[in-house]
């Protein structure tokens, strides 16, 4: 290629869109190069901000919050112990009051904080985050207000020492922080829900960080958050969770390292010191499997009792009557009850003594035998005099000061009592988690089994190796992982245990026990998080058990909603309006080709249809039509006036009235005072004259500067007082009179807008408004003004329930339309899938080819108790068919202890509508356009408004038109009488308020 060809090629590349060429100078090339470099740097920096720096900042913030909360909790708990130590030697009753009062006070403060700042902070947070990641929006659940309430309330509740956890609430806290950071990065208008895909990625990372900064376990935190919040997880988001969790765990461990008392924080790193070899024998594996089996059964019982307790508090008539009016009684009573049972000088001495519930984990993991004799080599050593509670284990907490109690008694008492106390504590209206209590209970059970095995065979005689010791601490680790896995239905809890203990020598026993416990519990009960979702009636799709083939046999045609409401291409605006008004809870409407074929062509969201209807017959559309009509009428009047002027050019009958300043055209209206005893008008008192041209100008200003009232005229029957406005007999009256008659004939009225809308608009009233609305409602649908989803998800009527459940879970669907050869025959939403699953779980067998909604109810029917079942059957509305199950969804709105969360439907997020207009009842003046609004005292009467302006109003600096706005009281004969008054030059008397004086005109 020659040099000339290269130059021409470069010139062609640098041509602009206008056909011009840019000379190839060195300066231009340098600027282009620098510009490209700047854009590249900007793009790279934006990418770094949105991913790496964002995730690192999220991890660092959560680590700091976690460490700060642990420090505050430790000081609160130590404060209680110091107060108790001061008084326990003097008086038993005083010690009891101090112990109980301290706990009750903190719980009461936490409950008040959560109740009045943000009720969304109550509870764990993992169930709610599970629904949010599914696509549900919970009102104000990720707000700063909720974050503040959660942090304060959780610190107070954990500082009380009750059996509560921190892991679940911190998942919620991390999600809120992720949401707020997203708002800062992407702007306050967007937030976490601006992009649903983006929100899922960041919230998933936030959940992982919440677990990681609680246990300092980044790997287990990521895996656990995925298990409890996701059904299907996108692998591309894996690195986000690990990176943010690693940043959080790293900073958290560094902060603990520099903390003096870090070893005894509430959620500490429980380092164990088991030897790498000979931790367990193969002969012990059946015992570990048995621990998993028992923990699976106990975990199912725990979930069941928790659900029954919550439902009992909702349904019991006495609880309803008390807690509805005095909700503080419940937290006070439960806090008093739990703290009384744990009182160290009472029953508490058989459950660990003065050791706090959250601090017992390290004692359960200690590598010594509690039941060994004091002089045994494997016995737990006594603490030294200069040892602190952070680096020693005091066996006297579990055996008494004089070794009076057996560890079997104290461990058994601890498990039984705290098993029920943990359930009661989880029902309190305060921020609290459930992970840590079940973790401690599992460790206590494992320790009990380990001590029992040690008592029977302390030196491993079953193996023939006298050098081997049975280590109860290993059993405690296995029990903690197994029971926690059974309650939460997770396997990743084993990884958390490995990171908590810092050892992998007990990997095999832990995995065996966790898998068995998880399998047993999954067969008997849902996880604690799914149970809470059902209790709170949050919209979420339950899992399908793989133990029966009924889920493969039930077809969509047996639980779809049919017939359903749809929109056709030939539908009218009225059809759409009726559909929106009658089906207020449907979020999207299917669009079909026509009423006959019902061929599905797409779907339209409710918000789109609502905006379309508003644009056709809404307030703004009506105002625009009124403005068009008044302008058209005034233009016609102008043309008519010019025609008459041309035909009567020699007519000079118009007279001018001379004032002190000069001559002006006479006005048809006079403002004169009216005597108290009667409406006598003095015709020699005039305000000022308005020319015909100025009156026309005032009436043709933009609609935002003119305001008209309805012409439904009715004069109040009362004696007139104050001042009046009087018409004068002039020959030019026909022009202004014609305009007046035109306005009254059009029935334009004055309305009062909300304060945020200070503009004036024309409006239609009466028959004209009705005729216009009827005309608009009969118009055909204009598809060009709608954003149509042309590819809605469709399923065949023969799709199985199992396959539909998999598709909904994998793709994150909210609804799917059921078609037969392209013809729309029904719709299936998340609610129908959930009801079908619960139908099969209740033990019923569906009749082939028959809808489960049309089957006759039986005694065991889960639909029998629903008051809205018949409504759902009759209308076919998927949202109106709500059924009652044993989960207590019918009582979700009656929970006075833990207020229900409000679900925000995306279809309800429509633009703000104009509020209902109110009528003016008093006089107002504005400096921009000085005028007076005179209205009838009767609230039911309407007025006609005319704006008159002085001659020099058009010359004002800001171009605005000032003047006098007069609201003429209506007459019984309505607009026809107003026209008669104008044509006959009848004296019109308008009542003015007493504070209006002549100088204001």
From Swiss-Prot:
Changing residue 232 to A: Loss of gck-3-mediated inhibition. Residues 1-48, 525-1001 are cytoplasmic. Residues 126-133, 202-214, 218-226, 473-487, 488-489, 490-501, 502-506 dip into the membrane without crossing it. A motif (Selectivity filter part_3) lies at residues 433-437. Gene3D superfamilies: CBS-domain, Clc chloride channel. Expressed in excretory cell, 4 anterior epithelial cells of the intestine, hermaphrodite-specific neurons and enteric muscles. Expressed also in vulva and uterus. Isoform a is expressed in oocytes (at protein level). GO terms for cellular component: plasma membrane. Phosphorylated by gck-3; phosphorylation at both Ser-742 and Ser-747 is required to inhibit channel activity. Dephosphorylated by gsp-1/2 during cell swelling and oocyte meiotic maturation, which results in channel activation. Residues 625-657 form a coiled coil. Belongs to the chloride channel (TC 2.A.49) family. Isoform a interacts (via RFLI motif) with gck-3 (via C-terminus). This is Chloride channel protein clh-3. The gene is clh-3.
